[in-house]
Amino acid sequence: MHPIAAVEAEMSLWSTDILHNDIAKTCAELDIPVIAYSPLGRGVLTGSVTSLADIPDGDIRHHMSRFQEENFKHNMKLINEVNELATRRGVAPAQIALAWIRTQSNKPGMPTIIPIPGGTTKDKVVQNMGGAQALADSEMAEIEAILEEHTVSGARY
């Protein structure tokens, strides 16, 4: 039998569960990398979703708890603060979201974390590959404060 080569788990500023439920810790202890899917929070961390009207009719997100009106309104507080940080840094919000994951990966006691963002255009793929590769300690502290202040409302699915 082949040993586990990687663990695929949802991870983003929108979904930090693996940092709190011992998945990341266990992967680090066993030297198993994490493949972080949906690192852009189903698109909300790209800066292109500012209201529910930005999500096309028939999109599955309309059926997800985090995208219901009250939850979405609350969750936009987190998104707006991430967008402000991106603006100050001169990068796209998606680059901040991906850099946060890369920086988590470099912390002691964390596994290697490989984000796998989607890209609907060549420009988005290029954008996701560039920009903010890692965040400064002060930026990480700012993001941690944002996450503590604005807990995401609604279940993942």
Model-flagged regions — what are they?
Residues M1-E148, V152-R156:
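Beta/alpha (TIM)-barrel catalytic core signal, keyed to glycine-rich beta->alpha loops juxtaposed to Asp/Glu
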